[in-house]
């Protein structure tokens, strides 16, 4: 039976109003992943379609819809053996909190019920106001009679979508009467709540293990905004080097479920402080919460007598370029990720491009927005009407709404161009197949269909490759592209060993040194040719040995091509 994977990449937008909605979607995605794992716990189509193959009982109170997804997969299993997994997540602000919780649940098959309680019971604004920022009995008393007409005016100006209810009025009054000119909400309390929620996911977990199938990985990226920024080098013609400050930053986490059964995870219990800090930093809305710094999490853990055993690993993975620039990560001040990147679609696409598969994949990129249709053709500061907007509406939209509601047209257009390029490359491969098969037939003398040895296969491969040498217009540029790709990998490897950040002056210098060495050693040349009778790698010319040892991307493409051919059998 045909095997297929449905791989989901999630983009969780920022916005506290989306938080609970996104969390509900995440619970369903978690149950879908649970159902897929349960369906594939047996081998073979007959066993999977057996009447006794049902979703296991007692799988957890929050997994009640998983049985529905299990039955759906079983019904689809009559036609295709479908496996479903979430392997890419990116998020900003409140979306980052939800993305981190979902990634941890997927990586270790944990419950999201504690996160549900976090949103519904612990995320109340009045709880999050810092004790020293709370209004006294007579603090800003004049807002009591003014708030209702003020909100009514804001509604007329288009600043509010609906008329606030009494509960909202009470919370709005508490907020506006709290401390001014300093963040009123308690950042340390938010860190504590996030840490508690992530730790509590271990309680009531469904089962030990992971929802990631063997041989797959899960990648997570959350956006943060570096208040001071970091210098980036730009290599231009004149002047040769420019510098600018980059304030956008991604915090990255990953989990790999190896085929040996081992789980290399950034989402384990010992990583909870790292995850809580990332969530706190990405959700530090300017003006409401104070900026996030590492010292806040250090103080919280010290007060509880806990350790942050993965702190150095977290910093090495996410702040290596800061250290390479002479900056101390402890001094970095982080703001809400939605300030500069509220919809991190390209971060998700970057992961999609490097995730490998062993069977046919149906890829879906999902961005969660409960009002997607309503927003088509509607600007961030518009109610869809006509006429001149109010003064405060314009000010609010310019300073807040418009920067946080940038359209995703460019990102989706880039994805469309990428998909179109893939389709064209596939069509080119299909059209060239007859000529390739004829060339291989001539090189092997028709012996490829019978038994052969590894030595014969090696000889045929060199012979067929060298037959292209009769077309130097194609052959030499092809070899040169392979050599340069291998040299890029070598330069990147040396750069990582030397602690050079990508695109840094040091990395640029290493690249130039490697290419100069390759030209001097005859690795970069005008013409490329390998003798047909070469028996060992050591007898290969220098350029071929470089490709054999460092042409990792070339080898990956070859393996992927073989896997694609096997899946078509």
Over which residues does each language-model region extend?
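Extended hydrophobic secondary-structure segments that form protein cores and membrane-embedded regions
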Residues: 8-12, 47, 85-93, 125, ...
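Charged, amphipathic alpha-helical linkers/stalks
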Residues: 365-368, 375-499
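Patatin-like phospholipase
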Residues: 19-196, 236-245
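Extended, Lys/Arg-enriched charged tracts that mediate electrostatic binding to polyanionic substrates
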Residues: 185-211, 216-219, 227-230, 341
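Active-site gating loop/helix substructures
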Residues: 166-181, 215-354, 399, 403, ...
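Hydrophobic, mid-to-C-terminal alpha-helical segments
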Residues: 358-362, 374
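Flexible loop/turn segments at secondary-structure boundaries
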Residues: 17-20, 96-99, 228-232, 340-343, ...
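Small-residue-rich anion-binding loops in enzyme active sites
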Residues: 1-13, 17-27, 31, 35-36, ...
């Amino acid at each position: 039976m045909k095997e297929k994977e449905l791989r989901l990449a999630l983009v969780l937008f920022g916005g506290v109003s989306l938080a609970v909605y996104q969390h509900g979607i995440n619970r369903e995605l978690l149950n879908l992943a649970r159902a897929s794992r349960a369906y594939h716990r047996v081998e073979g189509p007959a066993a999977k379609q057996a009447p006794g193959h049902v979703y296991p009982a007692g799988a957890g109170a929050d997994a009640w819809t998983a049985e529905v997804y299990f039955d759906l997969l079983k019904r689809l299993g009559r036609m295709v053996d479908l496996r479903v997994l979430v392997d890419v997540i990116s998020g900003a602000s409140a979306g980052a909190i939800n993305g981190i919780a979902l990634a941890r649940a997927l990586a270790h098959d944990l419950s999201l019920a504690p996160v549900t309680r976090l949103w519904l019971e612990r995320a109340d604004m009045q709880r999050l106001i810092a004790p020293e920022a709370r209004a006294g009995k007579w603090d800003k008393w004049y807002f009591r009679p003014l708030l209702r007409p003020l909100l009514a005016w804001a509604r007329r100006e288009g600043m509010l979508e609906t008329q606030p209810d009494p509960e909202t009025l009470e919370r709005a009054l508490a907020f506006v009467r709290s401390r001014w000119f300093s963040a009123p909400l308690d950042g340390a309390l938010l860190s504590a709540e996030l840490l508690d929620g992530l730790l509590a996911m271990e309680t009531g977990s469904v089962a030990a293990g992971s929802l990631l199938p063997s041989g797959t990985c899960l990648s997570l990226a959350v956006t943060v905004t570096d208040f001071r920024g970091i210098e980036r080098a730009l290599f231009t013609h004149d002047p040769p080097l420019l510098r600018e400050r980059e304030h956008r930053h991604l915090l990255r986490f990953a989990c790999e479920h190896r085929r040996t059964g081992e789980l290399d995870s950034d989402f384990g219990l010992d990583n909870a402080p790292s995850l809580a800090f990332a969530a706190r930093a990405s959700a530090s809305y300017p003006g409401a919460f104070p900026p996030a710094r590492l010292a806040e999490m250090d103080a919280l853990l010290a007060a509880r007598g806990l350790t942050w055993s993965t702190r150095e690993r977290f910093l090495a993975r996410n702040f290596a370029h800061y250290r390479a620039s002479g900056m101390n990560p402890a001094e970095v001040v982080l703001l809400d990720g939605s300030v500069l990147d509220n919809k991190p679609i390209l971060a998700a696409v970057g992961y999609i491009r490097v995730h490998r598969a062993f069977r046919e994949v149906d890829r879906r990129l999902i961005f969660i927005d409960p009002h997607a249709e309503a927003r088509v053709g509607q600007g961030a500061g518009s109610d869809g009407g006509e006429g001149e907007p109010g003064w405060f509406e314009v000010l609010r939209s310019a300073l807040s709404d418009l920067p946080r509601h940038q359209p995703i047209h460019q990102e989706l257009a880039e994805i469309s161009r990428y998909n179109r390029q893939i389709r064209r490359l596939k069509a080119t491969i299909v059209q060239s197949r007859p000529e390739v098969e004829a060339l291989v037939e001539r090189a092997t003398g028709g012996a490829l269909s019978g038994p052969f040895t590894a030595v014969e296969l090696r000889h045929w491969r060199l012979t067929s490759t060298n037959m292209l040498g009769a077309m130097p217009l194609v052959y030499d540029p092809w070899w040169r592209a392979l050599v340069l790709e291998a040299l890029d990998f070598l330069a990147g490897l040396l750069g990582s060993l030397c602690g050079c950040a990508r695109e840094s002056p040091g990395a640029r210098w290493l690249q130039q040194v490697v290419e100069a060495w390759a030209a001097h050693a005859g690795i970069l040349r005008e013409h490329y040719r390998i003798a047909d009778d070469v028996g060992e790698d050591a007898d290969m010319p220098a350029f071929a040995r470089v490709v054999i040892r460092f042409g990792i991307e070339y080898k990956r493409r070859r393996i992927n091509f073989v896997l694609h051919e096997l899946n078509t059998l």
